Structures are given as C-alpha cells and as structure tokens.
Amino acid sequence: MILINGDCIEQMQKLIDDGVQVDSVVTDPPYELGFMGRSWDSTGIAFQKETWELAYKLLKPGGHLLAFSASRNYHRMAVAIEDVGFEIRDQMMWLYGSGFPKSMNVGKAFDKKLGNERKVVGMTNQQDIRSGNYVGKATDTKEYSRIDVPITEGNSEWEGWGTALKPAHEPIVMARKPLSEKSIVDNVLKHGTGAINIDECRIEGNDAKYPDTNPDFKDIGRQSKEAIGIDKLSFGQTENAKRKKVVRKPRNESGVWTDGNSGMKAEGTQYADADPKGRFPANIMHDGSDVVQDIFPDTKAGSYKGDGSKSGGIWNKSTGKPAGREYGDEGSAARYFYCPKTSKSERNNSTVKNNHPTVKPQKLMQYLCRMVTPKGGIVLDMFMGSGSTGMAAKDEGFDFIGIEKEKEYFKIAEARIESVEVKATLQEFME
C-alpha cells in the first residue's frame, strides 16, 4: 500500500516511469464547482486530458476507471476521459436524499428590490448551510445545526420561482482501457482485467433467496411437502424454486422483428429456475433514505431484517446467505445496491478528526472497488481526499495507491486507512 502526499500529475508520471501498473482506478475528483471557496475545487484538473491520460497509462489493458462527478458538468470530465482513449462503458448513479437546493427565491428577491413587504405565514426548522457541510455529499445530517426560519409570502408575479433544483444524484463514469487481446477471455488470462465481478456485487432479493415471500413463485413448499413430506422453503432450500417469466413471441422465419413479435407482445408466462445468487447489479446505487425510497413507491418490507447497513444488501458468496436485508423486493429500491450515508463515527474513525467536506461512504467505495478489481489487484485513487477509497480497498483485500495534494487531508487519510484492520485469509489463519 502506497500513500503519496503530492501533486497527482507529477506523482502519476513518477509511477509510470517506475513501471507501475494498476488494475483499476476508483476516484472522486474535484467537481470543479468552486465548492465553499476551496481552491482545490476550481483548478480544472478533472477536465484536463493530461490527468486521465496518465491514469490510462497506469492501467493495465482492460482495466476499469470509475470516477464521480457533479451532475451539471459531468460531461466535461467524461469527454476528457474518452478523448485520451478510454471506452465509456456506462454511467452509474449515486442517489441520495440529503441534497439541499441552492436556489434563489426569485419572488423574494423581487420584493426586496422593489421594497415590498412580505407577509410571515409560518416558521420552519431547517439545516443551517452556514455550518460548513456540503449537504449533497451524503454526510451525517446529525452534524448540521438547525435554525428557525420564517416562511414568507409576497405579491410578486414571480412568487414561487427559483433558480435551481434539489441535488439528488452524483453521476459516475464507468470507462475501460481498450483490450490488448482479441477477446475478453484472452485479455483476462493475460492481464486479469477487462471483466466486471458480477456475482460478488449481486443484490439480494425475494425472487431467489426468499421465494416464500414472493408472489411470483409457485407454491413449492406445499408441493414438496405433498411429494416428500418436507417443506423445502422452511429450510431456505431454493434449488427447486421457480420464478415467473414472461414468454415473448419469437422473430419471424427471416429473423426480423415486426410489430407482432417485437418482444412487447407476451404469449403467456412460464416458470424458470431462480438464480440463488441474487439480482444482477445495476447502474444505480442509493443511500437508503426515505426520500430515495419514495421514488420507488412499491417498496414492501420483507420477513427478514438483517444488518443491511453494514452489508449494502450484497449477497455473501462465502456463506451462501444474505449479508443483511432491509427491503422487500417488489419493483422497489431493494433492486439496487444501497448503503447509509457517511456517519459521524465513520468520518472520525481514527485518531484524527476528519474535516474533509466531501466524504464518500466506505461501503459504497468497497462495492465499486469490488466490482472492477480482480482478486489481489491494485486500486489507484489519485484524488484520495480523506481516504475512503483506501479504506475500502484495504478492507476488500486489494492493494492501494493513493495520492493527495493537500497535506491536511493526507494526514487524515493516513490515519483512517491505518485504522482498517486487514482480514486474515483462512490459509493465513491456519498457519
């Protein structure tokens, strides 16, 4: 594990000169919004081709890059990444409910300019944005002070107009360095990169692991009990479970789709074997907040409630059991990876107080590292900040190279990463 305090352009070039190669890049660069007047958030480095060209050179062929950005200027970073040779594979979304709309009240501004009096119609208790935390970064809401603010109403024709929407997502570019070999298989065999770790990022759900609570399943328990005297579902056995599958009309003889067989025309339903490993990972993640869950109104509580806040709703392959479940699974937010916002204890889980304003949840970064990094691989984060990616990589058993220019944040990152205990493998434990 290598932690470097220095300029990322200079330090990445040194790593290239030393022949270093990494398996993945998972990073949260400056959003170039001039956030809170911080100089490091207005340098333009996230939009520079040179930044991503160096990352490109450090990556093995087929290696993936995951980089966060802001919704309003994501395109500039994505274009810079693509222009240096990366293939844009997808755009992921991190949804959260803690965003605060930085919108001007146009009606109020009009009344102030014209000297109109506004009528106080009530009071509200809201977060004090002057407390210095960035609401759109999923930090613990308990850290915000709250103040009473009067609700006023004016007579301007522009009453109710504003200038901005409530921020509720951060896009993540998923890019891949082109393969050096003719196929994915050959590239993986040679470099260990090029593929995505689907099974280790599957999302638990009723359709496979809890067929007894899923209305789409046949009554396997009753049928098995009648046949062999044992209710298989009572033991959580799902090898005979079936899920409902819509049968689509096939193409015509020439293999051409028509209005009559477009795939939207269903002939009926059949029952297919359920996948016990869980749902296929999607390009949406969320913080599990009520605001986000309300977007998916079909959320229905399941019969089992585990410690989902620690697992992120991920299927635990090593035990064959869910790592924890807090949602049902009927067309709801449960279909997507979730982890709670960065808590105060997580921010300050070392001997150094963490005052970095844009801390990502460690579990979110673990999920991303796990998705694109092969076993024993090296993760690079050239915008290390307070070290969440480093903590995630270490916790997942990956090696890590982190670069951070700001001395203050570098010391915080060192302490936070040091606080993560390395999990011993079974072989190491036996030895």
Q: Model regions: which residues?
A:
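Core catalytic lobe of class I
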Residues: 1-431
